[in-house]
Amino acid sequence: YEGNETAIISIGSVSGGGASESGTQSVTITITENESAPTVTLTVSATSIAENAGSSLTLTATLSGKADEDVTVTIGTAGTSTEATDYTDGSGVINDMTISAGNTSTTANFTPTDDSVYEGNETAIISIDGVSGGDASEDGTQAVTITITENESAPTVTLATSATSIAENAGSSLTLTATLSNVADEDVTVALST
């Protein structure tokens, strides 16, 4: 796809028969594009991925037809997960994706961060926020939702005491300690009862 193009044809020189150019002579011809302007779609290789080290998915931005210049696809992120904390492109944030002139697709990695914090399953919504170059546009609203499945166990709470008996005198005390089996991503409140 190149869009409509123009060709300007002019007289370069005239020779023979005593003829000469009458002023500056040129004609403009419009070449009407017969291809539709390309549209961009966004897909992902799977909609769920475990938070295990080394796992990744492939995001693909695809043009419906070739463009004669680079097409830049601006990426947006949302969901319950946080880009650069819960996932990256393997080295950092998922940047704009560029489909080079003459090509129809480009890819980016989606790599979850394997941490030791229990967060539960999280979602990442990767969307197209804009398209520029090659007269291309987004095909409707393009977004993919990825579930990052938690690989840590939900934390459990244990209760311990510094002593099992205490004197009833003034100033006597003992310490109760509530311990989580692993780190949680939010405060955990332990309500005590007697």
Residue ranges and their predicted role:
Residues 1-194:
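Short boundary segments that mark the start of a structured unit
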